[in-house]
Curated annotation (Swiss-Prot):
Organism for this UniProt entry: Drosophila melanogaster
Tissues where this protein is expressed: In third-instar larvae, detected in most cells of the optic lobes, showing an enrichment in the lamina and the medulla neuropil. At pupal stage, expressed in photoreceptor cells, as well as in the postsynaptic cells that form the lamina plexus and medulla. Also expressed in salivary glands and pupal eye imaginal disks.
Membrane association type: Multi-pass membrane protein
Cellular component terms per the entry's GO annotation: cytoplasmic vesicle; cytosol; Golgi apparatus; Golgi membrane; membrane; protein-containing complex; Ric1-Rgp1 guanyl-nucleotide exchange factor complex
One example of a Gene Ontology biological process annotation: synapse organization
Main location: Golgi
Gene field: Rich
Protein name as annotated: Guanine nucleotide exchange factor subunit Rich
Summary of the function given for this chain in its UniProt record: Probable component of a guanine nucleotide exchange factor (GEF) that may be required for efficient fusion of endosome-derived vesicles with the Golgi. Plays a role in regulating Rab6-dependent CadN transport in photoreceptor cells which is required for the formation of normal synaptic connections between axons from the inner photoreceptor cells in the eye and postsynaptic cells in the brain medulla layer M6, and for the generation of normal postsynaptic responses.
Compositional bias per record (Polar residues), positions renumbered to this chain: 1166-1176, 1398-1418
Quaternary organization: Component of a guanine nucleotide exchange factor (GEF) complex. Interacts with Rab6.
Top-level division of the source organism's lineage: Eukaryota
């Protein structure tokens, strides 16, 4: 839980002006003063800021007599130092403090006003003491001193070359005369004490031969909590020396040889966890614990780097150093390299994985060859002495660290946030930010994917990004850190941070430094400090810090009252003692924690006190002691208690009603890594001493949920054991039916089963700092490095260390352990509580993948394979098929036979996907089939899936399937598959067809960007004005997808070839589905299909214009479009007026007005106020199209009159625009803007394909009069009588349906279409010489190619112009004017201009004769039977 940040800095600890190398560094007990030793000098430095205080240089005579300096040892009170020299002598130095209290720094501002300090950071408020260093004496014993260590406040322990241990008093050294050989005050002859070897825990220790004659102690370290010393002898044997009492006499001492360690090089002791670490010449480190039963050594774990490390490349271990809190072990090797390990063996950092650049060989020339390590204040800095000093450069490096708040404040395990603390700053990563922001509740995640049955075209924004953010899990959360700098006013005198805490909501943080307290609000982004600085200096936080319901609670020591206290301060008030609450306790507080409304406190006298907390008001708090427990019997010393908490973890084992749900009954204590559970019985008096149950060992940190909700993941105890991985202690519950029967039958029956809990263990890839119970995720931090400069002379040549937040899912680990122990029901219940998580399928996939990899690659036979049980378990969930295929796709093909031999054949699984409508999963199985089956099988199943995907409108899937089918080589249809997986998503694009196709780029079905000025790319190959026989030869069909052919050959002939029938016809499938969509009036789906699948809609519609694109019921088609688009009903059932009544009222109503229909293009809907909406598109006007048609042709064409465009007297139709209309008659804009854009695009495609029926319906839906005008003019120019009759019938049918329903949406718009009906009637009646039977026989095969000019020769010679007779009762009748030989002949290219008037070329006015009227009435009677209305 320690992580380096920034660059390793070079610091100069030599004498000012010199660059001598430093041989040893040692900090005092409180890590404030740093002693640096060179060959001939001793320097004392202040830790922060790192400045020198005192120096002492030895004389030449002293160097010749005693040799150079080797190492330095501080006295615990920081007043004396013992210096060991190369000759084995001991020099004693005294450190004196100045009595005047003045510091060594005098801050004087310059006289210039511009240079005076204004900012707070420019003032050094720390009073750095003035010290003086002097040599007291030198001690030379009868034997050479090899090493020295301090064992108490007053004693030193010396090891000599004669294999003895000497115990000396500091005071005796002080009063000794110079150069006096002192006799041993207390001598321990190690060759006379027994040494034992305990190879197995159950074996008794046996005596072994004594030490070798020439061996002596080379390395020694003492710990009062283990009652002995860790020692390494000169012959590389490691031992543990223990004494029965503190006098260290030969008769009361014995030793244990460390088993399996024959090449020891260095040793170190962890006081808090009572661990002994021994470094070996093989570059490994072995760690041992003390067995409380026998007092011997018990192997704990081994530290060794194996990843990317060559054997024997590191060399021997030359330094081991535990951090001040015992949470981290720093290891260095002789060949270079530094690593950090957690207490029980989890690797936190290794410089061998750092990026030193390409020019650095870490094996031969490692830049970090270190010989000494020393931790600075609170473990925030690590001093490193390089083995080979560089010329004119300091050999001391300082590496900065941040550490988890759990290291000093274990009660932070209940927080869902990662909080790291530096010496003057905090790093915060809030673990549940996305939960609270986007999900709206704790532990709930929005779905990351669309539903299986969600329609892609269900809304108008289907091709756009969703408005609301979707996140799959907390894994996608931002990994940036929130860095909070400590206020300068507080950090200047209270550096460094000792404790840090954050509330469960992540809104408030509290920090405690050397004295006082400060807290920060993430809402207001402001720090709160004590207004009275003296109150801040009056107490020291010593036992922990936590938040409870808006109060910050701490254990502290009052410097003013000399008492130990519990203090509480509200967050909403200013920091002042008048708002705080104080409770005096009997001894210093070591640790504290909370459970709901209870506070548990451990004091230095070994008493655990439980307090009940309650809020009187927003600013007042009451604390009452509930009971006390004596825990001295379960620990060597209270300082060995790492953490503790109180919980109701085992409430389910008690009969209901014995204890309340909020009442805690269990105390969990971590003593030297052993988890002890103290069960409280509320029915009896609590004894003073308790028997504890050991749940686990080698535990660094544990987590418990304090939530009121009960679930499988919250009723567990989570433990982390370093190299042993993660552990979980969870209850084993019976099935639900048996559980209910047990509750009814009494607690005894239920207790027989429920008294069992199980401890499961599994590995983790990161060090867990936060456990999110509901999300089955652990959060942690990993170190990475970045190289900024590759120059050796640069200050930035060393890598820059950074931190990154990591996460890992552990659900599959727990499920596998439960299934392995035949606890499938418990695993199923746990999985059911997590199945709502978006990454639950991924967890099942990891579960299957781990078992498959382990069993399929095993070289030994597996007697009890776990894969069948895992498959049976996954089969209980609906994601079974998806889990199988996703696991297979991420596994080597060589393992597939083993997987599918137990999971089922891929063909059967594919069929199951189709039956359950899991089409995306079925598509993934095609990859499996392609590699395990012949290509013809995968092609058959892909075609089947393509057909189903089209039916269910899965356009993306259909697109991938088409690419998959096109990627299959036709030559491999019958050949066995090779071991190569072709991904559906990355299948190669189809080969370019040699046939000339229509340019689709400019007309892509873009539903989002809106209308764009389209190229007339289809007009070059699809022309609606050509006769059908010409179109058939000039319009290419849909291009084939499997093979190419010549450009001139029709595509239909190719698709009907024998070879193509043997393969899968993609085009036929697409055309068949497009035909079904068109017949069902699913125009939007047809548009999506063409957009996603690159289907050539215009060319296909040209072929289907007289088949699938032909409508019989226009009103029904319009009704179906409304239903598809979720629009209001166009023809409501309730109606009072029929079409006849409306038509009669129109004939009797007079008035005049001008048309509001313009020639602007798409947006030309008539509005009541006369304004017309104009289209941004630039389309060719109708007049330009007519001018293009004014070319010499076989048809007689009449010229228009100058100054007038009117050829019909449509006075009666002009009155339609001036009729009084109600609100229901007005045109209502019922289409959203984006939907309107899509429909207009479809309309243009239908017009280009000459599909007049659907073009007419779309124009009605869009209420676009200009489009209808263009359609009518195009029909007239096509000279197709049958099409004219169909269009006239369609308009009348729509008009009848509209006026039969009074609430129709198109009532007002249909009124504007009557001139178009009138124009079609006039044109049809103009063909009066054609018999009715001949006109009726004009079928689909001849409507575009029929030549009606022969039948009209007589009429063209007699009739000059037609003028409607407005006085006749029937407005649909024609009257023929007087014939004039000079009149122009009738042209069939009449058009309707923007004002709605019928325009036909006309000459001078004339009167019709009775002969002409009779001829007109006769022709009218003959065509009466041909009319549709």
């Amino acid at each position: 839980m320690y992580y380096p940040v920034g660059w390793p800095k070079r610091v100069g600890l030599a004498l000012p002006g010199e660059s001598a190398s430093i041989r040893h560094i040692c900090c005092d007990a409180v890590k404030i003063l740093v002693a640096a030793v060179g060959d001939d000098f001793l320097g004392i430095w202040y830790a922060n800021p790192l400045i020198p205080i005192a120096y002492f240089r030895r004389t030449e005579d002293s160097l010749r007599q005693y040799g150079a300096n080797q190492l330095i040892v501080w006295k615990p009170d920081s007043r004396q130092l013992a210096l060991l020299t190369a000759s084995g002598s001991l020099l004693l130095y005294q450190l004196d403090f100045e009595a005047n209290g003045m510091g060594i720094l005098q801050q004087i501002d310059p006289p210039a006003a511009s240079l005076k300090r204004d900012s707070a950071e420019l003032f050094i408020k720390e009073n750095i003491p003035r010290l003086s260093l002097r040599e007291l004496c030198s001690v030379t014993l009868g034997s050479v001193i090899t090493t020295v260590c301090c064992i108490s406040l007053s004693e030193l322990l010396l090891a000599t070359q004669s294999c003895e241990l000497l115990r000396l008093q500091w005071t005796e050294l002080e009063h000794a005369e110079n150069d006096l050989e002192l006799p041993a005050l207390s001598s321990i002859k190690l060759r006379d004490i027994p040494f034992y070897v305990q190879q197995q825990p159950q074996q008794s220790a046996r005596n072994v031969p004594p030490l070798n004659r020439d061996s002596y102690v080379a390395s020694l370290e003492y710990s009062p909590f283990i009652g002995g010393c860790a020692a390494v002898f000169s012959d590389r044997r490691a031992a543990f020396l223990i004494a029965n009492h503190l006098r260290f006499e030969t008769d009361h001492m014995h030793g244990f040889w460390v088993p399996d360690v024959e090449d020891a090089s260095v040793c170190s002791v962890n006081h808090k966890f009572r661990l002994l670490a021994y470094g070996q010449e093989s570059s490994a480190v072995k760690v041992y614990a003390i067995d409380d039963a026998t007092g011997g050594l018990e192997f704990s774990h081994r530290l060794i780097l194996t990843e990317n490390i060559l054997p024997d490349s590191l060399g021997s271990v030359n330094e081991l150093k535990w951090s001040p809190d015992g949470c981290v072990l720093a290891v260095s090797w002789t060949n270079g390299g530094l690593s950090l390990w957690s207490t029980f063996g989890a690797l936190l950092m290794s410089t061998l994985s750092w990026d030193f650049g390409l020019n650095v060989d870490l094996v031969c020339q490692n830049p970090l060859k270190i010989r000494r390590l020393e931790w600075s204040t609170e473990g925030y800095q690590l001093f490193m002495l390089k083995l080979h000093p560089e010329k004119d450069k300091s050999n001391v490096l300082q590496l900065q660290f941040v550490k988890s708040a759990l290291s000093m404040n274990p009660c932070m395990t209940t927080s869902p946030h990662i909080l790291l603390q530096g010496d003057d700053c905090l790093y915060l990563n809030q673990g549940n930010n996305l939960e609270l922001t986007y999900a709206g509740s704790h532990g709930t995640f929005p779905s990351s994917g669309l539903g299986s049955d969600e329609d892609i075209s269900g809304d108008g924004d289907c091709l756009e990004l969703k408005q609301s953010p979707h996140t799959g899990s907390i894994l996608t959360e931002s990994k940036y850190w929130t860095v909070l700098q400590l206020p300068l006013n507080y950090a200047a005198t209270n550096w460094p941070i000792r404790y840090a805490a954050i509330d469960p909501d992540g809104l408030h943080l509290a920090v405690a430094g050397r004295t006082g307290l400060a807290h920060y609000s993430l809402v207001t982004r402001r720090w709160k400090l004590f207004g009275n600085e003296s109150q801040e200096k009056d107490f020291v936080v010593s036992g922990g810090l936590l938040w409870w319901h808006g109060f910050v609670v701490m254990g502290c020591y009052s410097l003013l009252d000399r008492t130990d206290e519990l203090r509480c301060y509200p967050a909403d008030c200013k920091l002042d003692n008048q708002y705080g609450h104080k409770l005096q306790v009997r001894a210093p507080v070591i640790s504290l924690n909370s459970f709901r409304h209870q506070l548990i406190v451990l004091t230095a006298d070994g008493i655990v006190s439980l307090f009940n907390m309650s809020k009187n008001s927003a600013y007042a708090l009451d604390i009452e002691c509930a009971y006390e427990l004596d825990v001295k019997s379960i620990c060597i010393h209270p300082a060995c208690i790492v953490s503790l908490t109180v919980t109701n973890l085992k409430n389910e084992l008690k009969p209901q009603g014995q204890l309340g749900g909020d009442q805690a009954e269990t105390i969990i204590v971590n003593v030297c890594g052993r988890i002890l559970m103290i069960q409280r019985d509320a029915g009896e008096q609590v004894p003073n001493t308790l028997l504890a149950t050991c749940l686990a060992s080698c535990v660094e940190v544990f987590w418990l949920s304090h939530s009121l909700e009960r679930c499988a993941m919250r009723d567990c105890l989570w433990l982390y054991s370093g190299a042993h991985g993660m552990r979980v202690w969870l209850p084993i519950l019976p099935p639900g039916r048996e559980r209910r029967e047990g509750e009814q039958g009494g607690a005894q029956r239920l207790h027989s089963f429920m008294s069992k809990r199980i401890m499961l263990s599994f590995p983790l890839k990161l060090y867990p700092l936060v456990v999110l119970f509901d999300n089955v995720i652990v959060l942690g931090v990993e170190n990475e490095s970045t190289l900024y400069a590759n120059e050796q002379v640069s200050h930035f040549s060393l890598p820059f260390a950074v931190m990154e937040r990591k996460s890992q899912i552990y659900l599959h680990k727990v499920l596998r352990q439960l299934i392995k122990r035949n606890l499938g029901y418990s695993a199923w219940e746990m999985a059911q509580s997590c199945c709502s998580l978006p990454y639950f399928p991924h967890a099942l996939e990891l579960l299957l993948h781990e078992v498959l990899e382990e069993e399929a690659t095993s070289k030994q036979p597996i007697p009890d394979a776990q894969l069948p049980s895992i498959l049976d378990f996954i089969r209980e969930f609906p994601v079974y098929l998806e889990t199988i295929v996703q696991c297979a796709r991420k596994t080597e093909i060589a393992l597939w036979p083993y997987l599918f031999s137990m999971a089922g054949k891929p063909k059967d699984l594919f069929q199951m996907c189709l039956q359950s409508e899991q089409l995306d999963t079925a598509a993934s199985y095609l990859i499996i089939l392609q590699n395990l089956e012949p290509s013809v099988v995968s092609k058959q199943y892909a075609t089947m899936l393509l057909d189903i995907a089209l039916q269910q409108r899965k356009w993306e899937l259909a697109k991938d399937l088409i690419r998959f089918l096109k990627a299959i080589d036709p030559n491999e249809i019958d050949s066995p598959r090779s071991s190569m997986v072709v991904n559906v998503k990355i299948a190669p694009p189809p080969q370019v067809n040699t046939q000339q196709q229509v340019n689709q780029n400019a007309d892509a079905f873009n539903m989002v960007l809106g209308p764009i000025a389209r190229e007339r790319s289809f007009s070059t190959t699809v022309t609606s004005n050509l006769p059908k026989d010409k179109q058939a030869s000039g319009t290419p069909g849909v291009a084939p997808v499997t093979e190419s052919s010549s450009a001139g050959a029709p595509s239909v002939v190719r698709r009907r070839s024998t070879k193509q029938r043997e393969t899968f016809c993609i085009d036929l499938i697409l055309q068949r589905h497009a035909r079904q969509l068109l017949q069902n009036h699913k125009l939007m789906d047809l548009g999506y299909m063409c957009a996603y699948l690159d289907f050539h809609l215009v060319s296909w519609l040209s072929q289907e214009s007289e088949r699938a694109a032909k409508l019989d019921d226009f009103a029904g088609a319009l009704q179906a479009l409304h239903e598809e688009l979720d629009l209001p009903i166009p023809f409501p059932t309730a109606a009072k007026d029929d079409f006849a009544q409306i038509r009669g009222s129109l004939r009797q109503t007079g008035g005049g007005g001008s048309s509001q229909t313009s020639e602007s293009g798409y947006f030309s809907l008539a509005t009541p106020n006369g304004a017309a909406t104009q289209s941004p598109q630039l389309q060719p006007s109708i007049r330009e199209e007519e001018e293009e048609l004014q070319q010499p042709s076989s048809l007689p064409i009449l010229k228009t009159r100058s100054g007038s465009q009117l050829s019909f007297d449509n006075f009666r139709y002009r009155r339609l625009y001036s009729l009084p209309t109600s609100e229901d008659d007005l045109a209502v804009d019922i289409l959203p803007q984006k939907l309107s854009i899509k429909l207009r695009y479809l309309l243009q495609l239908f017009i280009e394909a000459n599909c007049t029926d659907y073009a007419l319906v779309l124009s009605i839906l869009l209420q676009d009069a200009a489009s209808i005008s263009r359609i009518v003019n195009g029909i007239i120019r096509s000279e197709s009588v049958h099409t004219c009759r169909r269009t006239e019938s369609a308009l009348k049918q729509l008009s009848q349906s509209t006026f039969e329903h009074s609430g129709s949406l198109y009532r007002g718009f249909v009124l504007t279409l009557q001139p178009h009906v009138y124009l079609l009637e006039q044109y049809i009646q103009s063909l009066g010489d054609a018999p009715c039977s001949q006109l009726q026989d004009a079928g689909p095969g001849t409507e575009q190619g029929v030549d009606v000019s022969t039948g009209l020769q007589g009429l063209q010679n007699e009739v000059g112009e037609f003028v409607p007779n407005s006085q006749q009762a029937n407005g649909n009748q024609w009257t023929v004017a007087d014939l004039n030989p000079n009149h122009q002949r009738l042209t069939r290219h009449a058009s309707l201009e923007s004002n709605g008037n019928a325009v036909v070329a006309s000459g001078s006015s004339a009167h019709s004769t009775p002969t002409q009227r009779q001829l007109s009435r006769q022709n009218s009677r003959e065509r009466e039977g041909c009319r549709l209305m």
